[in-house]
């Protein structure tokens, strides 16, 4: 759309970061595009919500509630059992799940994933909104390990009960190699969203906060390589 969004309100005067956009299907079948992002006022961060139908005009509004603290709130692409759903990281360490009747207010969250592997031992987060597949909700995650190294992993959540983790990758999907190590923020690969085209997952990701890469992988192949969670 060739639109550039600039800070326009005090909470975001010093930054609008990590927008996680999703194509959201409303109850009546119409489509709205939402984007959650982190606003920074130089001292504090907050969650904000962008909304657009055409990517030419946007509205922005605050997101409140204990589950919206921190960074990385990512909306599901539709309601589940009549409620909005979102991935959260309110404690800044684990991946959580929140539900709400009000897209602007998220009161509580429950933990669905804690660090288990060395590459994610320090911190977990999501890499954008879940992608609906026949097997479940495909969630890309990021993990932070030794030397503040960021890697990208994946989870599979139950379609009807997203709080239930069905499977997960034991090893990272993308890990910083020699070409990813140097840059403004070294040892980091990070994404705010991917999309599926037929059986291909297209994953844009940032490298060292300096350049962008794009990876593709079979959706079925990715899911089949996961380890089932008991």
Language-model-derived ranges and their functions:
Residues 1-14, 22-74, 78-122, 132-184, ...:
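Beta-rich carbohydrate-recognition and catalytic domains
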Residues 18-20, 127, 183-194:
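Signature of short aromatic-glycine-proline-rich micro-motifs recurring in repeat-based ectodomains
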